[in-house]
Curated annotation (Swiss-Prot):
InterPro entries: LS, LS/RS, LS/RS_sf. It comes from Burkholderia cenocepacia (strain HI2424). GO terms for molecular function: 6,7-dimethyl-8-ribityllumazine synthase activity. 5-amino-6-(D-ribitylamino)uracil binds at F24, A58, L59, E60, A82, V83, I84, N115. Keywords: Riboflavin biosynthesis, Transferase. Catalyzes the formation of 6,7-dimethyl-8-ribityllumazine by condensation of 5-amino-6-(D-ribitylamino)uracil with 3,4-dihydroxy-2-butanone 4-phosphate. This is the penultimate step in the biosynthesis of riboflavin. GO terms for cellular component: cytosol; riboflavin synthase complex. GO terms for biological process: riboflavin biosynthetic process. Belongs to the DMRL synthase family. Pathway: Cofactor biosynthesis; riboflavin biosynthesis; riboflavin from 2-hydroxy-3-oxobutyl phosphate and 5-amino-6-(D-ribitylamino)uracil: step 1/2. (2S)-2-hydroxy-3-oxobutyl phosphate binds at E87, T88, R129. This is 6,7-dimethyl-8-ribityllumazine synthase. Residues 154-171 have a biased composition (Acidic residues). It catalyses: (2S)-2-hydroxy-3-oxobutyl phosphate + 5-amino-6-(D-ribitylamino)uracil = 6,7-dimethyl-8-(1-D-ribityl)lumazine + phosphate + 2 H2O + H(+).
Amino acid sequence: MEIGQYQPNLEGDGLRIGIVQSRFNEPVCNGLADACVEELERLGVTGEDVLLVSVPGALEIPLALQKLAESGQFDALIALGAVIRGETYHFELVSNESGAGITRIGLDFNLPIANAVLTTENDEQAVARMTEKGRDAARVAVEMANLTMALDQLGDDEDEEEDEDDEEERA
């Protein structure tokens, strides 16, 4: 049996991307942002199609993502941050709540969000992961923006067929 299959599309030309970056653990977050923006450019996204905003910490990321999503100006969003374990329960709280908020915004607004909020045991792990995680976030955002647009067209095609059927029935 032959089945239809969508091939991943990493062409970023014309895509509008919003990035929300935490300033807490700033050196790691700057490394994430640098790698992410560099990869977006490599994928064909232009600087004029990227907006980067910063927030104090990971718990503030979902609200900024929500405001960007509400604007309707973006094809995908990217969350960048670093939560590094300390000696208190705060690590679990920040990790879980920021992750849940990021996911909720994406689902509520039907908008892809690449979650590149690192959660690591120590600074060394965060530094070791920041470059590849930043690049990966760019690739995820571009691929998922293209995928959601392609899937949205499936629904548009079905709507057009229904409209044509309705017109034929009236004739």
